[in-house]
Amino acid sequence: MNILVVDDEMDIRTLFEQKFRKEIKDKVFTFQFAHSGEAALELLQTEGSSIVLILSDINMPGMSGIELLKRVRIVHPSAPPKVFMITAYGDKENRESASTLGADDFLTKPIDFASLKEKLQ
């Protein structure tokens, strides 16, 4: 399973990689990382359908996670990757916007990696 993690903070991307390797320990997962919504779209164009899950922060400079979700749903209407939105706070407005656009799930920081692993099974 090819997973794209999108977050503007390098520390968060590094933490995701370390936690996945340590706590999930599953060889079927491969990871790619993008520092922005724009970089994520570029990766999606080159990788095509190999990315099956996007874990995207909602609040990023430039293109937000909400805008990324919107564009992913437009570019991949028939077989879109799953998109889990990540936020440091569970504000209702962002959740409603993301739900309306087709977000598959929400994760609140700090991430519970055991729970995430269950969702990925």
Tell where the protein language model's regions lie, with residue ranges:
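A Lys-centered signature of the CheY-like receiver
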Residues: K109
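Alpha4 helix (beta4-alpha4-beta5 surface) of REC/receiver domains from two-component response regulators
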Residues: E67, P80, G90-D105, S115-E118
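Receiver (REC) domain active-site loop signature in two-component systems and cognate sites
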Residues: M60
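Active-site beta3 strand of CheY-like receiver
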Residues: G48-L55
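Helix N-cap/capping motif at the beta->alpha junctions
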Residues: F33-E42, G65
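Hydrophobic/aromatic residues positioned on beta-strands within the core alpha/beta folds
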Residues: F84-I86
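Short amphipathic alpha-helix used as the core "switch/output" element in two-component signaling
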Residues: E42, I66-A79
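Two-component/phosphorelay signaling modules centered on CheY-like receiver
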Residues: M10-Q32
